[in-house]
């Protein structure tokens, strides 16, 4: 699933996480998808498994690229906010409200960065399952 049209709200981490959860639906359902669309040997003649695997491959690639873009975009936005708050903090060391905002943004940035690790695990799992079922029917392009 691609990201919703328009820009992604990176301000609230809970919304960011919810968006990623929705965008990871294809990965969460890959086993079911493969079981219902890629035939076993006994049903091989009834469905074009190579076309089905190709379509699933393209959907997975699009979802992974889209999520990677969303995560990295939010990391960049939050990093810019942290940088700005640090600069303000250097000018005004006594402002406790500013310090709290800085700490909050730094924490959010760390959580967003950890989503890159989660993404790697999710992607690896999906490709492992995909390759187990589709390697006989479809060979992905070498450049991807």
From Swiss-Prot:
Please give the PANTHER family that the UniProt record associates with this protein. Answer: COILED-COIL DOMAIN-CONTAINING PROTEIN 58, PROTEIN MIX23
What the entry lists under InterPro entries is as follows: MIX23
Family statement drawn from the similarity comment of this UniProt entry: Belongs to the MIX23 family.
Instruction: Provide the positions where the record notes the PTM N6-acetyllysine.
Output: 100
Q: Which UniProt keywords apply?
A: Acetylation, Coiled coil
What is the name of the protein in this document?
Protein MIX23
Q: What is the lineage of its organism?
A: Eukaryota, Metazoa, Chordata, Craniata, Vertebrata
Naming one, the record's GO cellular component terms include:
mitochondrial intermembrane space
Coiled-coil-forming residues are 82-120
Residues modified as N-acetylalanine are 2
Question: Key word Coiled coil present in the record?
Answer: yes
